[in-house]
Amino acid sequence: MKKTNIHLEKINWDNYYKVIKLRVTKEQENYVASNKASLIHAFVESSDGTPVYAFAIKNGKTIVGFMQLMYGDDWTGYEREDWLNSEEFKEYNGRPYYYIWRFMIDKRYQGRGYGKESFKQTLDFIKTFPSGKAEYVVLSYEPKNVVGKKLYESFG
């Protein structure tokens, strides 16, 4: 495997359009929202005062992916009612968390270790508690996304 220079760069005027143009494979399109939709969601969520962080994932100067997370302690408005009504949710409700909301590597750059390294850096960023302490980190993924599940489980 080639040596990587993976790092996270906050979304800005210089990189947002390139991030919007990133794509996953056809099979993966049902696993993650488009980056354009994700940035719109981030804008709306942040306009309500929720801390949202959106990053381009870069290898050197090349944008290879996108990651977005938020901080909160309230799940009001969350789309997955099945989870909100679960016993597991009751354990977490009202406790501060970081939610890895979006995570993707462009189809041209998959299989090179960029996902693993950038996910590690995402967790390292969260450990700085940029919006305050949190008791847990949560993410969601489609059950058919076997590659994503394997990646996330490798971090515990």
Predicted features, each with a name:
Residues 2-108, 119-121, 125-131:
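Acetyl-CoA-dependent GNAT
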Residues 106-108, 112, 143-144:
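Active-site acidic-Proline motif in GNAT/NAT acetyltransferases
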Residues 116:
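Residues forming the Rossmann-fold NAD(P)(H) cofactor-binding site
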Residues 133-149:
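Conserved beta-strand-loop-alpha-helix junction that forms the acyl-donor binding cleft
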Residues 152:
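Conserved active-site tyrosine of GNAT-family acetyltransferases
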